[in-house]
């Protein structure tokens, strides 16, 4: 039978599309809205590039490459998925963290959390990166960014455990079956997953290095010419 999306995912971000869909209640409206959301990522991408001193031509190239990346824009032709919000919102959050802009970082992080329950992982990783960077730099000017990042990290954990508990009690439960090769003692808890990684880290390394996953990593990095690995700051 039919099942509500909200029985398996917590995605209130979809309500941002509701006013437009109410005006034009057609499937094509959702496709156009998804394309607009994806395209909006060029705004924070442009601002991040400008913040780091890239020229106007370089900024245009960055934005063009983002829009032309097949894995990014290809889904607009046939599908609708809440993950379309992730890239623009995460770029806004990274911009907010980069510039220590509290309103931008907090609002974009909050909206990212409303995309899906596991979107908290993206917020947590970005916040953790910012915490480590601030600690390594150690300058007094980093205190504001450090506190902001620590707050977002705590919020991401609180949200994740809150919404997963909600899905377990009032929904169909969290879709944890994809991690079943990490579970033990007949447990399907995400806490068991974390425990398994700490108890046997080589299992996590092995799972990450399977041939098909290495191929996927090669395709991903190849399309980006390895640019994510070219940096002067490896924190």
Regions flagged by a language model, labelled:
Residues 52-53, 85, 91-104, 131-138:
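Membrane-interface transmembrane helices that cradle and orient dolichyl/undecaprenyl
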Residues 210, 214-235:
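Hydrophobic, aromatic-rich transmembrane alpha-helices
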